[in-house]
């Protein structure tokens, strides 16, 4: 019996929010050396939390592993996907935020509005872009239809296979903008 030893780094996928709740969408893909974050949202409180403006994820794991954080990728510009960015960047350094054009403009406005002095590098992406993160991840994007223009899903190719997140989407038979790219999503 032979034993194969793999030099591939195991991949962890976890949510800091957004599962079983509406809002706080923040997902991470991590290997031995890298963390990429997909979306950084807030949740708006229910009536049982008077005086609370936003509910944000617990960033402890990211703070404890901050040197591994390589990028934040945004699927679209709704608050439950971008509203946590000012809070996240006050806890950890984010080297670069990749976002579609509309979301990038909304993020810049939000950071100005909250008077956050940190320099944040924001790079706009399109459906045709490929972004390489170290030797671990290659990220590409596909158009989706949603209630806000400029919405995308994200494909992350890893040594272990492909991870796909759709962000928020709906199948719209008469979209106002570009139609969902089902072929690229598959």
Residue ranges and their predicted role:
Residues 2-73, 78-186:
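His/Asp/Glu-rich metal-coordinating catalytic cores
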């Amino acid at each position: 019996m032979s034993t194969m030893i793999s030099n591939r780094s195991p991949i962890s996928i976890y949510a800091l929010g957004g599962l079983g709740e509406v809002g706080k969408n923040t997902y991470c893909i991590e290997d031995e050396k890298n963390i990429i974050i997909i979306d950084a949202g807030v949740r708006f409180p229910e009536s049982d939390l008077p005086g609370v403006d936003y509910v944000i994820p617990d960033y402890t794991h990211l703070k404890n592993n901050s040197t591994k954080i390589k990028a934040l990728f945004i699927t679209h510009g709704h608050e439950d996907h971008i509203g946590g960015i000012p809070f996240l960047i006050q806890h950890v350094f984010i080297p670069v935020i990749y976002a579609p054009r509309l979301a990038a403009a909304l993020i810049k406005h939000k950071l100005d509005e909250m008077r956050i002095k940190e320099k944040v590098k924001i790079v706009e992406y399109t459906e045709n872009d490929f972004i390489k993160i170290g030797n671990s991840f290659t990220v590409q994007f596909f158009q989706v239809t949603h209630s806000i223009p400029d919405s995308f899903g994200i494909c992350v190719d890893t040594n272990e296979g492909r991870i796909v997140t759709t962000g928020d989407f709906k199948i719209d038979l008469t979209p106002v903008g570009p139609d969902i790219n089902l072929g690229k999503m598959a």
